[in-house]
Amino acid sequence: MGWSLTAPTLPGGSEWVQKDTISISNNQLDVTGTVFCARLADQGFALKIVETRTFHLTNPNFTDFYKTYHRCDVAGVTGEAYTESHFGNSGSTKTYYFTGIAAAGASIKVVVGVKVDTATQEISFTAPALLGPTVYIKVGGAWKQASAVYVKSSGAWKEGQLKINVGGAWK
């Protein structure tokens, strides 16, 4: 869990979905970042931020001065900030990844920016649906989507795992 420069492995049925693009400009640099989200197993999710920086002046210290700043807040809980001191050459692109836990429909806020002058932009969206089969239960004559399946075991209700037999194989 947390920030990385290594892409997580997406499970079958999951894909990167673009959420938004940010753009930050000042008199020394332009930052453009595209934010993607994907669902991982269980309640896990992943973010991908593809960021490009263009420096207007040729001062090599700008790549160290304008630090990368990323943060992911889930369900109103402020996440730990990720900062990186050296971005790379002007015009280069870098990809950052974040993995975390969020229930389907939970609020996710991604903060992308430049730490030195606190120039940031925020993107908010809801966590994607969980992977796996959708189960419907008839309640009062109407079919409703089940958010979880519970099984009574030894007098206590426990969340169960739903499996289906497809062509003789349990999935």
How should each PLM-predicted stretch be described?
Residues M1-W143, S147-V149, S154-W170:
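Polar, enzyme-active/binding microenvironments
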